Amino acid sequence: MIHFKRSQRKYVKKTYRVLNRHEYEAGLRERGSLTVWISLHDGKLANWDAPRPKKRKPGRQRKYSNHAIETAVTLGMVFGLASRQTEGFICSLFTLLNLNNDVPDHTTISRRKAKLGKVPFYENKQKTPLHILIDSSGLTVHVGQLRKPPKSRHYRKLHLCVDELTGDVVACDLTSKSARDSSRVPSLLKQIDSPISSARADTAYDARGVYEALDNHLAHYSPRVLIPPRKDAQLASTSATTRQRNRNIREQARLGKRKWHTESGYSKRSKVETTFYRYKIILGPAMRARGLASQRVEARIGCKILNTMTELGMPCSEMIG
């Protein structure tokens, strides 16, 4: 007989019902449409060939544009294809469409992917204040064939900043597993040019630098920061950056941890966990590339894919029991 603790009995799995089932299923079908991932204009590929440089540089000139390489990487990630399979898939696609464009081989795709740099994946068109959720998770990487298995698992840390209302990935960063979560918040905020209304993160981000980075993000905006303090957290001297942390410490001590999570709105942070679940289920829990530069490009393209799928349609549900 299994005995549960008293605290474990309070958690009961909720039952939800999808309200927009027909619209959501239509969006799921659109995820497999090639017209979503390949841009065509008048039956021709848009921006596939590299533009001619104004001044000729020494060496061989580029034949394919960055857009062509990004499209090839995107197709491989969406449909779960290896590099050579992606090359064959694009060749057969061009044959069916009667296109005379050349197809980059797998070595060109792998080499050029590391040079794509910061691929844009999010744009706040309305410029409204954001309610952001910050967290990180690990993605395993291939370490090659070793005589002995490694003592610890080798992985990369994917840091995401998610919009609470829309579920879009606002900012992302990829680091080694030794990087601290709190140290990557300034680099995430540099990618956001919109004002921030509130920010939620777990206890790993309970650091002075996180509060300072959020408070100094944009002038005339002071976001509400909801980060549960550590067990040994102490009140600091009152200042502009420590005022919110002291407030979180006092409220959690007065209400209790669980009640503070509910009343303060911190429980909405679980939506960022859903984003990581979507990333690992749709794109896989492991990185395809070997080098860190290519892996960072792959992570940004993965975030762009998730945002595109979010735009196609997401479920709207209500709790029924």
Role assignments for model-derived ranges:
Residues I2-Y16, T203-K280, A293:
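Helix-centered, glycine/charged polyanion-binding patches within enzymatic domains
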Residues M1-P58:
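Basic, low-complexity segments
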Residues P53-E70, T74-R84, G88, S92, ...:
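Polybasic low-complexity intrinsically disordered regions
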Residues N66-V78, K257-G321:
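Basic, amphipathic alpha-helical segments enriched in Lys/Arg and hydrophobic/aromatic residues
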Residues L34, L93-L96:
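A short structural micro-motif
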Residues K13, R31-S33, K127-H131, S267:
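Sequence-level motif detector for i,i+2 pairs with an aromatic at +2
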Residues L28, D173, C316:
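Short, flexible helix/strand-to-coil boundary loops that buttress conserved ligand/catalytic motifs
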Residues L97-N100, T308:
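Short arginine-rich
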